[in-house]
Structures are given as C-alpha cells and as structure tokens.
Amino acid sequence: MGESFLLLQPASPALSPTPSSLLLGPTITMRADVLIAALATGALVAAVPTSPKKPTPPKGDVSNPFVGKTQFVNPEWSNKLTQTYKSFLKKGDVKNAFRTLQAQKVSTFVWVSRLSELSRIDEAIATARRVQKTTGKKQIVGLVLYNLPDRDCSAGESAGELLSGENGFERYKEEFVKPYAQKVAAAKDLEFAIVLEPDSLGNLVTNLNIPLCAGAVDTYRDGIAHAITQLQQDHVHLYIDAAHGGWLGWNDNLPLAADEFAEVLKRADEASGKKNKIRGFATNVSNYNPLHAVVRENYTEWSNSWDESHYASSLAPHLEERGLPAHFIVDQGRVANPGARKEWGEWCNVAPSGFGPAPSTNTNNTVVDAIVWIKPGGESDGECGYFNAPRAGHWHDEFAQQLVQNAHPSVYENWWKFW
C-alpha cells in the first residue's frame, strides 16, 4: 500500500484572501448579551459535551519558541467568521453561534502569498504590538511565506504569480523575500514563527514524474534556501514545510524527505558562507490529519505515520542523522471526522471536518513544539471536494459552519475566560 502513495497529490494551501478591517465587527459585541442570557438559562450548558482528559505537557524544552508566548490572533480571519456567526443566529442556532464567537479568539497564521500581500505583515505587526502592550503578554506571530515561482506544481489549485521562465526567481528574491525579511527583522519586540513554502519540497520527494515539478527542483531548493539565509534573526523561528504523514510518512519516503531537507540547508549554508539555523518543520499544513488519532483509519494500515504525532516521531531520527533539528509544529486548524475520507489522498475541502484542538504547547510528544492553526479554516482549498466550493482562498461560509459544528471542545470549553 505504501507504494500507492509515492505520487500522492498534496493538500494545496489556498491563497490568502483580500485584507479586511482589523477590528472585529460590532455585531459580535451587540449579540454577546444574547448568548450569555442563553447560557444562563441552560440553553448552552446542556449542549456542551464533557471535555476530554487534558493531555500531559511534554518535558520542558527551554528553546521551544512557543513556551510562555501568546499566539497571535489574526483579526482578518476572525472578521470573516462574523458571517458564520450571523448565519447561525439567522437559523436560531444559539449553541453554534456561541461556538463561533469562541473560534474567533483562536490564533491563526497570516498567509503572505503574493507581492501585493506583503502589507499583511505590517498589519499583523501593528496589531500584535497593540495586543502585547495592552496585555503585557509576549506575542508570537505566525506567518506563512508562500510565493515560489512555479508554485503548486502538482495540484495547480494554488498556482502563484511568479514563473521561473519570466524572471520569477529574481523577482522572488528581490521583490518578495527581501521586503518580507526586512519587515520581520525590524520588529524585534515580537517573536515570529514562519512556515516556509508549503508543499514545495514534498513535491520534490514524490512528484518528479510531473514535468512542472521536475523543472522546478533548483528553483524550489534555492528559493527556500535563500529565504532561510534572509531570516536569520534571533526573534525569528523558521519551520520548513514537511507535508504530512500520508504523504512523506511512508517508510520509503522518510529518508528521502530528510535528504531533501538537508540539501536545502546545505545550499543555504553554501550561499551565505555560514551556518544557518531553522527551528524545525511544519506538518499537516492545509491538510486534515489529526495530531493524535482517536480512531485509526483503514487507509493508514500499512503506515507507521498514521497520525501526525506518529509522523513526527517517525521522521525525527532521520532528521537527527543528518544533523537537522527534530522539532515540529502541527497544523490542526481543520481535522477530518473519523470516516470522512475513503483515501488518504483526499485533501480538498474534506467534510465532515471540524476545527481541531486549540493551539497549545501541550502536545503529548516531546518533538512537537506546538499545536497551531496554520490554514485559516473556512477559506476554500479550491473548486473541488465539496459541492459549490469556491476558488482557493475564497471564503466558504457553508464549510465554515460545519467546522464550527464539529469543533474540538478545547475551542470553546474555556468560554468564561473571554467575558
């Protein structure tokens, strides 16, 4: 069965949407009293299930950049959930309207996927600084750097604006990575966790039979290596995208993946003439795998990487053998319900699915730094997988509603902390 996944098409991260207001809409504030009243009457209490047993935190890693920090809540994404909130209220679904309010307070990464979206970094920095000043709590801002030339070479749902045949590589370095790095470097009062180029290196491990991927090898390797060399600040923590367990977690693919990552770091060191650092690797970006599977799916039968925790543990020794850091962050922004997929290769707008466990450093795996939400739930994966799904990156309220309905209890169980 492992062989059948060697050419598995990945989950393509959707392009980020057009920026919106950085302030939460007034509707949320005005309706909060309605929800509190409903809670007081027992309308919500009966609906909230008993929370699962809390995971035990991993042994302390003082270098874990997420420990002691507050993950940045992206108001651009939170504002989009206002539509979902209103949809539930219109249907009289107070319980899920309440859950939506809590989801709006969860941290998500900010995607910078085009030259025109570089301003999102400025907006995130300004907002994080305000929150940090108001709360006195150190902010760690999650960003995604995603604009390689010939991007998304295997799936095509999130193809980018730069082409290697049209001076795309030079534009990537000068017009995208350079200002990106300058903006981040100037904000030394904040911490940053940056995910580098989702899906790209995974495609080089398994999809070189696709002409566009075969032609993108040096562009991908050198592009990511260049980004690494430009983001070597102490307050910046880099995570190279490592696909997910259903893609690179097979025994044959694990050493190949580690070799690919090592090659990129080698190129970064050669290009800069010095040793470059990364914190580790990001897994499950824009996919639907659980960190800790409650039910083992049949299609994972022959894989030791049957959830993302097992994938991280399986990949870690291969990384360490090559002198690479075995630290991970795992995207749990969307997790498929058990039985939602017939095959592991289903990646596009998978349903039923829900918001996964809320971001935390309690991961029950010593190589996993943190649970994070990288892919903003509710933004479409593309025109596939779900009836009438919009283009990649566009808001899909119907899909967002089922994410709320199936949300992990940790998303809303501590509601009283927000009032």
Curated annotation (Swiss-Prot):
InterPro entries: Beta_cellobiohydrolase (IPR016288), Beta_cellobiohydrolase_sf (IPR036434), Glyco_hydro_6_CS (IPR001524)
SUPFAM superfamilies, per the entry: Glycosyl hydrolases family 6, cellulases (SSF51989)
UniProt catalytic activity: Hydrolysis of (1->4)-beta-D-glucosidic linkages in cellulose and cellotetraose, releasing cellobiose from the non-reducing ends of the chains
Positions annotated to bind substrate: W111, S113, W247, N287, W347, K375, E379
Protein modification: Both N- and O-glycosylated.
Lineage: Eukaryota, Fungi, Dikarya, Ascomycota, Pezizomycotina
Pfam assignment, any one: Glyco_hydro_6
Active site: D152, D199
Thermal dependence of function as given in the entry: Optimum temperature is 45 degrees Celsius.
Main location as per UniProt: secreted
Signal peptide: 1-47
Designated gene of the protein: CEL6B
GO molecular function, one term: cellulose 1,4-beta-cellobiosidase activity
Activity sensitivity to pH: Optimum pH is 7.
Sequence similarity: Belongs to the glycosyl hydrolase 6 (cellulase B) family.
An individual GO BP term: cellulose catabolic process
GO terms under cellular component: extracellular region
Keywords attached to this entry: Carbohydrate metabolism, Cellulose degradation, Glycoprotein, Glycosidase, Hydrolase, Polysaccharide degradation, Secreted, Signal
Residues bearing glycans: N284, N298, N364
Top class in the EC scheme: hydrolase
Designated name of the protein: 1,4-beta-D-glucan cellobiohydrolase CEL6B
